[in-house]
Swiss-Prot record:
Ranges of biased composition (kind: Low complexity): 336-348
Species name: Homo sapiens
Ranges of biased composition (kind: Acidic residues): 45-54
Protein name: Uncharacterized protein FLJ45252
InterPro entries in the record: AP2_assoc_SerThr_kinase, BMP2K_C
Amino acid sequence: MGTKGLPLYPDPSRVPGTKTQNNLESDYLARDGPSSNSSFHSSEEEGTDLEGDMLDCSGSRPLLMESEEEDESCRPPPGKLGGAVPFAPPEVSPEQAKTVQGGRKNQFQAFTQPATDGLSEPDVFAIAPFRSSRVPNDDMDIFSKAPFVSKSSMAPSQPEESDVFLRAPFTKKKSMEELTVIQCTSQELPAQTGLLSQTGDVPLPAGRERAVYTSVQAQYSTAGFVQQSNLLSHSVQAADHLDSISPRGSCLESGGHSNDRNKGPQLQKEAVSGPMAGKPFRPQSLSKYSRHYSPEDEPSPEAQPIAAYKIVSQTNKQSIAGSVSITSLSSRTTELPAADPFALAPFPSKSGKKP
C-alpha cells in the first residue's frame, strides 16, 4: 500500500497496463476456475493451485486484488502525467546571447581574414626572402640588383661576342688570310724590280724601293715575320750594289753563306754517324744476351776506335790512343767468373740444399 497523494508506481505510463492485467485475473478467478471442460491438464491445474496458495500465504494480494477505486485514487493527476516536460535551459540575458554570437562570428572571420586582408595588409612572405605570387609586376627583378647580369642586357651583346677567339690575344681568321696574301705580294715585288733592272727599263729609284720596303717592315714587324724582313733588307742591298743579279739570287747567296757556316758541324756529324748509321745501337756488354745475337755481328776490336780517330786531329791520336783501350767490352765481361748472382744475394743457394 502506498501513501495517498504520491504515485505508487515510478513509471506512470505502465499504470493502464497493470489495470488490464488485474481485471483479467480477477475475472478468471471469479468464475468457477478451470472447468473440467477446459483443455488444461491436471498438472497445469495443480500448478495454478500452487500459485494461488503462494499468493494467499501473505494474507492479502496488495497488487492484484485492489479495487478500481484504490487504483483511481493512486493514479497521479493528469497534469503530472503529462508533465514529462523537457528540461528548460537556464534563462540567459539577451546581452550575453549577443556576446556569444559575436564570438562565434569572430571565429569564422578569423579564417576568412587572410584571404580578404591580403591586398590591404602586406604579406609576411612578401617581406621575407621568398617571392610570392601577390608581388606586383612593377617590382624589379632580384637578379638585376645582384652582381649577375640580367637577360635583357645579355641578349644584344651575344651576337657581337659569340666567338670566343675574336678577343685578344687571338686574331680573326680573315686577318691571317690577309697576312698570307700580303706575304705573297711582298715576295713578288723584289722579283719584278729585278726583272726591270735586267731588261734595261727605267728602274725605280733606290730611295723609293727602300721606303716601300721599310713601310712593309713597319706594318708586319712581329715575331713571326722577322725572317722575312731580314730577307727583304738583304735583297734591297743586293739590288743597289749589283743591278744585274736578281734579289732572289742574293737571298740564296746569303742563305748559302749561312749554310757554309753550318757545313763544319754537319761534316763532323756525318763522320760520326756515317759508318754506324745503318746498324741499330746495341750495347756490346748486353749483345750476347739478346735473342738475335751472332758472333759475326761483333766488330773486331781494331775497328772500334776508327770513327773516333777520324774526328780527332792527327796530333792528338797518340794521346787518345793511350787512354782508350782497344779491347772490347764484351771481352771484359767474358773474363768475369760465371758465378750465380743469387748466390751472393741473401737467398740460400741451390747447392746448399743438396745433401
